[in-house]
């Protein structure tokens, strides 16, 4: 169902500022480090998000009333132009689990720092990671490295999906640990992307690496 801002009744101050048009860019929220408390904020400011179901898994646990079975779903969302999110959802049925995962992915949305960081590429476009970065989740660790334009995404399928949704087209990678575990590999990739924005660099260095922000 498409989002209709006119039907939205914001419950938070931030939501009201978005609906009235005072906040028109999600970067204003990210720059202040404010948490997103309403999904409609993301729907209004980043309306072109795409969704990809990464994994559907059956999870069982013992309860005093018997064995409980839930579906655990991992979903990635992104606009293929610098914004991506990853979320997990659990429910007794697949449909509700997917919806929960999509919602959580939107709450976890981040802006991804992109650039042209490979020394052999001088295109100046935002097609790769601007510098080497590492991410970790449980036993899985991943390194993402700048690659020249045209190389493509040299990473596992889970990583390709997330990086593609983030708008990264070229990357070299190394991974260690139980990378066949989708949830951990996906979280490690996402952790690496979050680290991109956390690394401090001078404006001059960022300009050299083709970073636009």
Curated annotation (Swiss-Prot):
Pfam families: Ribosomal_S5, Ribosomal_S5_C. GO terms for molecular function: rRNA binding; structural constituent of ribosome. The keyword Transcription does not apply. GO terms for cellular component: cytosolic small ribosomal subunit. Residues 49-112 form the S5 DRBM domain. One of its GO terms (biological process) is translation. Keywords: Ribonucleoprotein, Ribosomal protein, RNA-binding, rRNA-binding. InterPro entries: Ribosomal_Su5_D2-typ_SF, Ribosomal_uS5, Ribosomal_uS5_arc, Ribosomal_uS5_C, Ribosomal_uS5_euk/arc, Ribosomal_uS5_N, Ribosomal_uS5_N_CS, Ribsml_uS5_D2-typ_fold_subgr. The keyword Metal-binding does not apply. With S4 and S12 plays an important role in translational accuracy. Belongs to the universal ribosomal protein uS5 family. The N-terminal domain interacts with the head of the 30S subunit; the C-terminal domain interacts with the body and contacts protein S4. The interaction surface between S4 and S5 is involved in control of translational fidelity. Part of the 30S ribosomal subunit. Contacts protein S4. This is Small ribosomal subunit protein uS5. It comes from Methanobrevibacter smithii (strain ATCC 35061 / DSM 861 / OCM 144 / PS). The gene is rps5.
């Amino acid at each position: 169902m498409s989002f209709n801002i006119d039907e939205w009744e914001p419950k938070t101050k931030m939501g009201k500022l978005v609906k009235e048009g005072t906040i028109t860019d999600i970067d204003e929220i990210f720059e202040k480090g404010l948490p997103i408390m309403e999904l409609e904020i993301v729907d209004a400011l980043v309306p072109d998000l795409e969704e990809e179901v990464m994994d559907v898994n059956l999870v069982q646990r013992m309860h005093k009333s018997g064995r409980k079975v839930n579906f655990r779903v991992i979903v990635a969302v992104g606009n293929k132009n610098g914004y991506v999110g990853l979320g997990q959802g659990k429910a007794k049925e697949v449909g509700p689990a997917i919806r929960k995962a999509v919602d959580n992915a939107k709450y976890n949305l981040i802006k991804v720092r992109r650039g042209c960081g490979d020394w052999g590429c001088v295109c100046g476009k935002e097609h790769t990671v601007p510098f080497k970065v590492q991410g970790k989740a449980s036993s899985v660790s991943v390194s993402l490295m700048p690659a020249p334009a045209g190389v493509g995404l040299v990473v596992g399928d889970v990583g390709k999906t997330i990086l593609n949704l983030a708008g990264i087209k070229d990357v070299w990678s190394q991974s260690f640990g139980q990378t066949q575990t989708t949830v951990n590999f996906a979280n490690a990739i996402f952790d690496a992307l979050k680290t991109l924005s956390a690394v401090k660099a001078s404006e001059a260095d960022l300009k050299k690496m083709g970073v636009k922000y």
